[in-house]
Every structure is written in C-alpha cells, then in structure tokens.
C-alpha cells in the first residue's frame, strides 16, 4: 500500500476506531449493572446449561446480584453469619422466568433473616423435559461447586436450606447427596414424577440427602412423584386434585399445572400467614378422612408437622423417622389454611342399613360439609372435616339424614342420635363437645343445632 493511501485511511478511520473502543485515560470502563434478572431461552437455542446464581438479601430483596466467583460473593452483600436459602426452579417448557419466583423470594426474606440464592438454569431446563433431566447431574455439580465457595467464607453446611420445585427438588437431592447428607434441610415442592418414580436413591430426592428432608405433594396422579421421598411427606388433599383447580382438559395449560404448582403457592402462603398448615400422620388418605388418625403421637410424640420455615417442620424427636406420610386439607384459595375437626354421630339404636349423615358447619356465611357413614349394625360413625374458621367461631351445625335416591331402597324411618365434635389434634377427651340433647333426623330434612364452644 502506498504511504499516501495509508495515511489517508489512518486519518479517516483512526478516530472512529479510537472512539469505538475508548481510551484508558478519558473514558470510564463499563460496569455490570447491579441487579440481574433471570435469563430467557427458546427452543431454537437448545438446552445448553447456562447457570446464573442470583443473590437476594434482606437489605435489597428485589435486586438479584449476580455472584459467580468467590470474589463476587466477597464483594456482595452476602452475610456468612446468616442462614442461606437456595431456590431451584424446575422444567421451563417455554424458556421463561418462573412467574412465582419474585413473590417466593420476597416471602422468604420477609419470614427469615437470611441470604437467598436463586439458581437460574432456564437455559438448561427449556424445550424437551427429558433433555432437562439429562442436565440434572451437571447442574447439581455446578451448584455444589458454588456452595463450596460459600463454605470457604465460613458458612456451615447445616445452615444451608435448599428449596427445589418439581425437577429442582431432585437437583437439590443430588446436591445433598454430593455433600453426604450434611446440608441442613431440603424442601421438595411437588418433586417431579416422570423419570424419578423408579429412580435409585442416588438419582432422586430421598431422606438421606440432608439432616432434614420434607416434601409437599400436590399432583401425584400427573406431574408429581407419588412415593414418599423425605423424613416427612405432606400429601395435601390426598396429594392430588387440589380444590379450585380445573378438573377437565378444556382449561388447557392451567389444567396441566394447577395441581403441580399448588405446592409452591401453599409454601408462599405458609410464609405470609400465621394460620398453620398443620398435617397429621396416617396410613392413608382414606383412613385420615375416616377419622382414624386424630393426633401426632405416633411417630412424632404430639409435635404435628407444619409447612413453612419451621425448624424441621416442628418435628423435634430423635432419631427422625423416614418416609412418614402426613395429610391435611385446604381451601381452594390463599391462604388455604383450615381447621380440622373430628365429627361423630352416635345412633341411639342399631340399624339394618348403612346410615349416611351430612354434617355442615356454618359461620359468617362460610359453610363446610362432610358425609359420615355409620355401617349397618353399628352405632358410631365419624369423619374429619375442614373449615376456614376455628370451632369457637362456628355458629351452627346442620345435620341431614341422607337416604338412597332409588325408590326400592328408600328408608324413611327417622334416626335418633347424638352429635359430637372436637378440633384436631385430639389429645384428650376434654376437647370434645356434644350437643346436649339427642337429635331426631327425618330423611332429607335438615336439622340446625347451635354450637357454643369457647375460644381458648
């Protein structure tokens, strides 16, 4: 190139090049923004793992600080003297940020003085579910390496609490497995079922993955795992068909995820409200509804487990039992909390047919009902029902003797008996309240009785 042409090009393009790259003396270097949000992905980008660790603190609960290396953590607002909550989302079909994550983080930080680490693996969880499953081991290793940096700063293993949603629950279990079960706690919010129901203990969440492991099951007949995987396993409303969720396909996407995501909303509600989501150990949901499991003595020595940021779920016995199924009922919307009651009806005389009685609690325009059945040639029938208000706020009970709709099976003979009720857990007979006089019930005709129970 001739010198004249070279000089011409230099003076024409040189200043533009200098302006585009900046100078070390006059232009300040660009800095990363303080707050970082979740990534977005799509099917065209595949499912390559691209993990972000976002730190949220009590001093700035809405700002996610990107922390990747040890130096990032040391220069952040991370407080090694506080407990650390690690939140791991699950499969993201559309590659979007979880809609619940901001509210979840805020609820945790309001309920606990802690560090919150949100694990953003949207890239690796997008597209095909089975591709996301293949990323679980690699993701678990990345999280484990990140936690090792926290341990170097003086964080104790026992102060780390992993909260995993769906597929994220099994990621948390694998991380706990890498730490030989010495992490403080793992909470699985409806742990994923597909590919994990028959998986080995090393591949899925189980009670050996942390000092305390709990799981909340809300969709065992579809996307959630149906087997117990922790020390305590909450089967909410039996673990499936949650109140308020659509029952038919025409509801579309909401039909698919409503039951599954109810575990997340229950946990948020438990953090935001004082009404306890208390559960009761029982062999089966059917037995629980039948009134066969009224306290928590076996195996918890009366300490009934509760959903939320309660130390070991409120279970303080040693050693901890494993894979204990506990059951609770809820309402159809937040705060979901109910007060469980035992309801009983004692016949004055035995009958030759089964006797069905509908029991309804009424208080402040809120009603709850349950049907109890007294088998033929027996005197007692019982069941468990749920009501949003405590018993002392229930004004009346409505009793209705139900008969068969089939003409040839109708029995119009009135029944006479005594109604009794008690709030769960029923630890002694002093809690039981009975209507003073026997009640005479005509077939199909409701009878209203006042309830007078003192608040304590």
UniProtKB/Swiss-Prot annotation:
Belongs to the AB hydrolase superfamily. Lipase family. Disulfide bonds join 245-258, 282-293, 296-304. This is Phospholipase A1 member A. It comes from the Eukaryota. It catalyses: a 1,2-diacyl-sn-glycero-3-phospho-L-serine + H2O = a 2-acyl-sn-glycero-3-phospho-L-serine + a fatty acid + H(+); 1,2-di-(9Z)-octadecenoyl-sn-glycero-3-phospho-L-serine + H2O = 2-(9Z-octadecenoyl)-sn-glycero-3-phospho-L-serine + (9Z)-octadecenoate + H(+); 1-hexadecanoyl-2-(5Z,8Z,11Z,14Z-eicosatetraenoyl)-sn-glycero-3-phospho-L-serine + H2O = 2-(5Z,8Z,11Z,14Z)-eicosatetraenoyl-sn-glycero-3-phospho-L-serine + hexadecanoate + H(+); a 1-acyl-sn-glycero-3-phospho-L-serine + H2O = sn-glycero-3-phospho-L-serine + a fatty acid + H(+). Coiled coil: none annotated. The active site is at residues 166, 190, 260. Glycans are attached at residue 365. Transmembrane segments: none annotated.
């Amino acid at each position: 190139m001739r010198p004249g042409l070279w000089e011409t090009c230099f003076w024409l393009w040189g200043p533009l090049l200098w302006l585009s790259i900046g100078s070390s003396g006059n232009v300040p270097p660009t800095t990363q923004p303080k707050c970082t949000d979740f990534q977005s992905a799509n099917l065209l980008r595949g499912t390559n793992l691209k993990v972000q660790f976002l730190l949220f603190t009590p001093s700035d609960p809405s700002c996610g600080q990107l922390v990747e290396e040890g130096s990032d953590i040391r220069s952040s607002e991370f407080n090694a003297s506080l407990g650390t909550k690690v939140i791991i989302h699950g499969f993201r079909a559309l590659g979007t940020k979880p809609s619940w994550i901001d509210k979840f983080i805020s609820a945790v930080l309001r309920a606990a003085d802690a560090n919150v680490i949100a694990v953003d693996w949207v890239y690796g969880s997008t597209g095909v579910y089975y591709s996301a499953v293949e990323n679980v081991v690699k993701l678990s290793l990345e999280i484990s390496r990140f936690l090792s940096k926290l341990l170097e700063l003086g964080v104790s293993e026992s102060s780390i609490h992993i909260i995993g949603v769906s597929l994220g629950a099994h990621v948390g279990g694998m991380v706990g497995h890498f730490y030989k079960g010495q992490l403080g706690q793992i909470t699985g919010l409806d742990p994923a079922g597909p590919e994990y129901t028959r998986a080995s203990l090393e591949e899925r969440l189980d009670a050996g993955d942390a000092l305390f492991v709990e799981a909340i099951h809300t969709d065992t007949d579809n996307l959630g795992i149906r087997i117990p995987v922790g020390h305590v396993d909450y089967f909410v409303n039996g673990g499936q068909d949650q109140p308020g969720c659509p029952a038919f396909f025409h509801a579309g996407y909401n039909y698919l995820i409503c039951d599954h995501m109810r575990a997340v909303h229950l946990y948020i509600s438990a953090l935001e409200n004082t009404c306890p989501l208390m559960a009761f150990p029982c062999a089966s949901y059917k037995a629980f509804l039948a009134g066969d499991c009224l306290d928590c003595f076996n195996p918890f020595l009366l300490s009934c487990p509760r959903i939320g940021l309660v130390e070991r779920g409120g279970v303080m016995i040693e050693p901890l039992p494993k894979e204990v199924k506990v059951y609770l009922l809820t309402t159809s919307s937040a705060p979901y909390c109910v007060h469980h009651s035992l309801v009983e009806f004692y016949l004055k005389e035995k009958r030759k047919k089964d006797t069905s009685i509908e029991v309804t609690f009424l208080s402040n325009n809120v009603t709850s009902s349950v049907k109890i059945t007294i088998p033929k040639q027996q005197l007692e029938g019982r069941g468990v029902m749920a009501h949003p208000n405590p018993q002392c706020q229930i004004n009346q009970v409505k009793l209705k003797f139900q008969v068969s709709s089939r003409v040839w099976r109708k029995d119009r003979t009135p029944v006479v008996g005594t109604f009794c009720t008690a709030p769960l857990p029923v630890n002694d007979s002093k809690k039981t309240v009975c209507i003073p006089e026997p009640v005479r019930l005509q077939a199909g005709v409701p009878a209203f009785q006042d309830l007078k129970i003192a608040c304590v």
